[in-house]
């Protein structure tokens, strides 16, 4: 088990910022293998204003985005760019996306991603999001990394 990664460290690993950062903390990871992170879902999320008034539910595509961000963190922890550069991961594909449980304010989404394969700049991962012990969402995700100047 590695030490946890807080939001300030996450900001060094992902380009996302409010209101689109969907990972609050990494609680465990092993480079080139897996990462476990959390997203605390609160009523203050801007998407709850319209999805849905009086019945707030986290959109499924944002659960997938949270998984994709967790994948980006794992990939960036697993590979070092050239001096003065950083990797930006583009969402390149998704397969087998399934939604099993609604996510509402007050839930803590546990994001578990596992590296399924990596070839050159392409990263394939499997992700699962849980509320407690209930599977909320799962998918196979593909990203393409591009090395860009800082």
UniProtKB/Swiss-Prot annotation:
GO MF entries: (3R)-hydroxyacyl-[acyl-carrier-protein] dehydratase activity
Top-level enzyme category: lyase
One GO cellular component term noted in the UniProt record for this chain: membrane
Domain of life from the UniProt record: Bacteria
Major localization listed first in the record, in broad terms: cytoplasm
Biological process annotations from GO: fatty acid biosynthetic process; lipid A biosynthetic process
CDD domains in the cross-refs: FabZ
SUPFAM superfamilies noted in UniProt: Thioesterase/thiol ester dehydrase-isomerase (SSF54637)
EC number, as in UniProt: 4.2.1.59
Keyword set, alphabetical order: Cytoplasm, Lipid A biosynthesis, Lipid biosynthesis, Lipid metabolism, Lyase
Pfam short name (any one): FabA
Matches recorded under Gene3D superfamilies: Hotdog Thioesterase
Catalytic residue list: 51
Chain's role: Involved in unsaturated fatty acids biosynthesis. Catalyzes the dehydration of short chain beta-hydroxyacyl-ACPs and long chain saturated and unsaturated beta-hydroxyacyl-ACPs.
NCBIfam families: fabZ, PRK00006.1
Identification of the protein by name: 3-hydroxyacyl-[acyl-carrier-protein] dehydratase FabZ
Record organism: Legionella pneumophila (strain Corby)
Organism lineage: Bacteria, Pseudomonadati, Pseudomonadota, Gammaproteobacteria, Legionellales
